[in-house]
Design a protein with these regions (language model features):
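Surface-exposed loop/turn motifs in large extracellular/passenger domains
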Residues: 1-110, 115-146, 150-176, 182-308
Length: 308
């Protein structure tokens, strides 16, 4: 079914096995069915989570059961068991606006601003996403919750997000924050064309990365302040990553290691960064004020970035 208006999901309490903002497109058969088309199209999605316990998804239709390694998926879910390449399974969403706010919300799985896709010729796409996490504590020392600006793809599927904005304000994340998506295998494809990550007074215990487990962001701008204090226009045909740290805290800052990527790092105020990784193949430009907390001295060169 398609939704021409806005699909709204409000969670204030209770216990759930996952939240999906978009539609569900399923093709269960593994028989020789050809030219099948299963599609859903949702124009707008609005998700507001202020309470409740949301566990990782465990779906069972009665015909087939499968798990989704996430508590929240902003886009839709496209799932297929068929291996016939003439079949088509798609879940499309126009715009996603998702908020997770307050100490009452408890999540045990990851958060994807984009959609979930599983199976050959299966695709989940989102035009734009906006995820806001405010005044929250997500995860625990023994239970990570990772945040992805993009979606998830497995078994030869494709998940795409055109533009994504992730804002984490006055919150603690026991896990990692990625400017890209996540794919389970080399046959799958995950893409985020452009992403903005803003960390304002956030404490991320793990990695803050311009990319994901595998590079999937074509153009990323990371901000750690209310205002953009980044560099100017990127050189022609050269992706640019801008990272602004203003009174922020994280375990590891992971910058792009793509050879054609220029990364600019700005430090203002008191920032605690355990280590910086990546960038060995990048041209790294340092232009800012402030130093990391502690006794470490920040070193940035074209060969890499590290603490001495």
């Amino acid at each position: 079914a398609d939704v021409k208006g806005t699909a709204r999901v409000n969670v204030t309490g209770g216990t759930l096995k996952g939240v999906v903002g978009g539609g569900l497109s399923y093709l269960y058969t593994i028989a020789a069915l050809t030219d099948a088309a299963v599609t859903t199209d949702v124009k707008n999605v609005a998700v507001n989570i202020t309470g409740g316990t949301i566990n990782a998804m465990d779906h069972n239709s009665g015909l087939d059961g499968f798990g989704i390694p996430a508590s929240v998926v902003g886009g839709g879910v496209a799932y297929s068991k068929s291996t016939v390449t003439t079949n088509k399974v798609e879940a499309t969403v126009g715009n996603v606006d998702m908020t997770i706010a307050g100490k009452g919300a408890k999540l045990s799985g990851d958060i994807y601003a984009g959609g979930f896709a599983h199976g050959a010729k299966t695709a989940a796409s989102v035009n734009s996403t906006r995820l806001t996490i405010a005044d929250a504590t997500l995860g625990a020392a023994d239970s990570q919750v990772n945040v992805f600006a993009g979606g998830y793809a497995a078994q030869g599927a494709t998940s795409t997000v055109k533009t994504s904005e992730v804002t984490i304000a006055n919150s603690k994340i026991f896990g990692n924050v990625y400017g890209g998506g996540n794919k389970a295998d080399a046959q799958s494809n995950v893409t985020v064309e452009s992403s903005v990550i803003t960390l304002d007074g956030a404490d991320v215990t793990g990695i803050v990365s311009t990319e994901s487990f595998e590079p999937s962001v074509n153009a990323a701008l990371m901000r750690l302040a209310e205002a953009d204090t980044g560099a100017g226009d990127a050189e022609a045909n050269k992706p640019q990553r801008t990272i602004n740290l203003i009174n922020s805290k994280m375990g590891t800052l992971q910058i792009s290691a793509k050879q054609d990527t220029e990364t600019s790092l700005y430090l203002v105020g008191s920032n605690t960064v355990g280590e910086i990784t990546g960038g060995k193949a990048s041209e790294i430009v340092f232009d800012g004020t402030g130093t990391p907390a502690g006794e470490a001295i920040l070193t940035l060169t074209k060969e890499g970035a590290s603490f001495d």
